[in-house]
Structure formats: C-alpha cells, structure tokens
Amino acid sequence: MTNIRKSHPLLKILNHSFVDLPAPSNISSWWNFGSLLGMCLIIQILTGLFLAMHYTSDTMTAFSSVTHICRDVNYGWLIRYVHANGASLFFICLFIHAGRGIYYGSYLYSETWNIGVVLLFITMATAFVGYVLPWGQMSFWGATVITNLLSAIPYVGSTLVEWIWGGFSVDKATLTRFFAFHFILPFIIAALAMVHLLFLHETGSNNPLGLISDSDKIPFHPYYTIKDLLGMLLTILLLTGLVLFSPDLLGDPDNYTPANPLNTPPHIKPEWYFLFAYAILRSIPNKLGGVVALVMSILILAIMPLLHTSKHRSLMFRPISQCLFWILVADMLTLTWIGGQPVEDPFITIGQVASILYFLLILVLMPIAGLIENHLIKL
C-alpha cells in the first residue's frame, strides 16, 4: 500500500516540500533563516491576533487600550513584547536571509529572488503601519513624516497623502485604516511566502559552492528538519531573553507618551530596521530625490541578477568581491547608526558618504570586481 503522505492530495504537497525534498548535502547554517522567517511570521500572526482581541483602533482609546493589554490582560505584557520584539527578530532574519542570497549568488534564481524583494517591501509596509497603532508620540509623528514623503510625487502627491490620511492630517481615519492594513498584510505575506517556496522548489536550493548539486542530494527530512528545529530553538531562546530581560531595548521612549499633534519630539525617527533607508533619505537635500533614493535603496535588490558579471555564482572563491560584500555590510550598519543621529555635522557628511558608497558598491564596484576576477582566473 502507498504511504498516505505520498498519495493524499494535500499531504503530497507537504511531502514534496518538507519531507522527500531533495536538498544539497552541503548547505550551511546560513540556509536556516528561511525557516526562521516562517517561524517569525507564525509568531507575529498568533501574538497579533491575541493583541487585536483587546486593541481598539480609535485615537481616543488606542493608547489606553495598549496600556490595558500590558496591565490588565493575562500575560498581555508578554504577548505585546513578543510581538514588538518579534518584529525586530523578523527583520534581523530578513536582512541575513537577503545577505546570504547576495553572498552565495542565490539572486540568479530571479523569480524566487524578485518575490523575495516584494516580500521585503510588504513586510516593511506592515511594520510601518503596525508602529503607528500604539498611538504614542513616535507613532503619530513617524506616520506624519513618512506618509508626507508621498507629497513629493509630482502632480498627485498632496492628493495622494490626503487620500491615505483620510483627511487633512493623521487622525482617526488614518489609525483605523492602518489597523485594517496591519491585520490583512501578514496573510498576504504568508501567501507570497508559499509562492516564494513554489518557485524555489522549481529549481532546488543553491549551495555555498554555487555549483550544480544534482549528483549529491539528501532528503530534507530528517537532516534539515532537525537542523531547522535547532535553529528555531536557539532563536526562540534569543527572543525570550530579549523579551524578559530588556523588552524596551529596541523601542523608543517617546512612544510611552500619548500622541500629541501640538508637540513635536526633538528627533523623529522610525524603528531601527528602517534607519538605513531613513539615513539615505535624509542624506539628499531635495525632497523628491530623497524619496527616490529611499525606494531605490530596496528596489536595487531587484536588479542584482542583471549586475552579475562573474563566471562564479558564489563569492566563496572571489576574494575581491568578498571584501566589497563585507564593506557593504559595514556600510549598512553605519547608515543604521546615522539614521538614529540628529541632523548635524559630522553625521550629515558621514550619511552622505555612506549613501553614495551603498549605491556605488552595488551598481559599480561589485560588477567591476566580478570582471577583474574573471580575468584573474585566466592567468
């Protein structure tokens, strides 16, 4: 008799995706972050669901409803902080996952890669609208400043901003629709993640060598299921430590003050995971130019397959490109730091240099390094 997992229409899909899937025998721990992202998404949807049961999306009661969750709901403080810090963990995993894709040339699976870029955009949108919901000072002013950037779009800008706000300022209508978006978007992310996996399983996983591994495959279960479970266990340990010992480490103290349209905080800044893009936005004096640079800082990932010039797929055997990759990582960390600093010298200059270097590395230096390395192979 055929095993039910191989014959049942639903189980068959799961079997081909997680049990009998042929996987390269040499994929390292950098390949764990896909499953960790799946875990983060499930944690966020579950904690978010329980938070939504007690939250009210009204400007008069939103802040006090979050206080009520933390003080009066059974383990409400835990659910709230797991959700808030889970978002940070989500982005850490996202950045590492995308970084691994760049390092090992996984972007050459262009369908999988481009869906990943779309997923990154939607996740950033979800996190942004979610940050507005507690209706603290930074929530309100963050929403005002970031949505206002759309007014830089020629002709339709100001109309578009008022349309998103649902009025002439960030108010009740804005909060209600942001809550609606924040509730629906994670399910769209989950659906797209399935499409992401579908395209990945069309080609099979890449591996650290960047070589075709058809001759040396092992079944996903039990080898990689155990490996993924270990990764999940360690990640949950990290999240638990953060939530129980310093839950406000990555948050902004200003968000413990209720939103006040008449009082602007001295430094308006988004959550830490947007700071690199925010620094690029601020480094350009022109408003429209800044918005274009902000969008391009993420959209640039979509053209990475077109910028690949090397004969090698992975950076494992390409020392010059390796150096440039780690300079790019350092540059992103520098931008993240600058995004959280006030707009004054020397931070302005450092931000401008780091922004130019960011685009220069991806668009010019890495493709040139690939060509140089091709030439060196022939010697």
UniProtKB/Swiss-Prot annotation:
Membrane topology: Multi-pass membrane protein
Subunit structure: The cytochrome bc1 complex contains 11 subunits: 3 respiratory subunits (MT-CYB, CYC1 and UQCRFS1), 2 core proteins (UQCRC1 and UQCRC2) and 6 low-molecular weight proteins (UQCRH/QCR6, UQCRB/QCR7, UQCRQ/QCR8, UQCR10/QCR9, UQCR11/QCR10 and a cleavage product of UQCRFS1). This cytochrome bc1 complex then forms a dimer.
UniProt GO MF annotations: metal ion binding; ubiquinol-cytochrome-c reductase activity
Residue ranges of coiled coil: none
Entry note: cofactor: Binds 2 heme b groups non-covalently.
Principal subcellular localization: mitochondrion
InterPro entries in UniProt: Cyt_b/b6_C, Cyt_b/b6_C_sf, Cyt_b/b6_N, Cytb/b6-like_sf, Cytochrome_b, Cytochrome_b_C_euk/bac, Cytochrome_b_N_euk/bac, Di-haem_cyt_TM
Keywords: Electron transport, Heme, Iron, Membrane, Metal-binding, Mitochondrion, Mitochondrion inner membrane, Respiratory chain, Transmembrane, Transmembrane helix, Transport, Ubiquinone
Function: Component of the ubiquinol-cytochrome c reductase complex (complex III or cytochrome b-c1 complex) that is part of the mitochondrial respiratory chain. The b-c1 complex mediates electron transfer from ubiquinol to cytochrome c. Contributes to the generation of a proton gradient across the mitochondrial membrane that is then used for ATP synthesis.
Protein name stated in the entry: Cytochrome b
Lineage: Eukaryota, Metazoa, Chordata, Craniata, Vertebrata
Species, as recorded: Macroscelides proboscideus
Pfam families: Cytochrom_B_C (PF00032), Cytochrome_B (PF00033)
Residues reported to bind a ubiquinone: 201
GO CC, one annotated term: respiratory chain complex III
Cofactor(s) it depends on: heme b
Residues reported to bind heme b b566: 97, 196
Residues reported to bind heme b b562: 83, 182
GO BP terms in the entry: mitochondrial electron transport, ubiquinol to cytochrome c
Record carries keyword Transmembrane: yes
Family as reported in the entry's similarity comment: Belongs to the cytochrome b family.
Annotated S-S bridges: none
Note: Heme 1 (or BL or b562) is low-potential and absorbs at about 562 nm, and heme 2 (or BH or b566) is high-potential and absorbs at about 566 nm.
Cellular location(s): Mitochondrion inner membrane
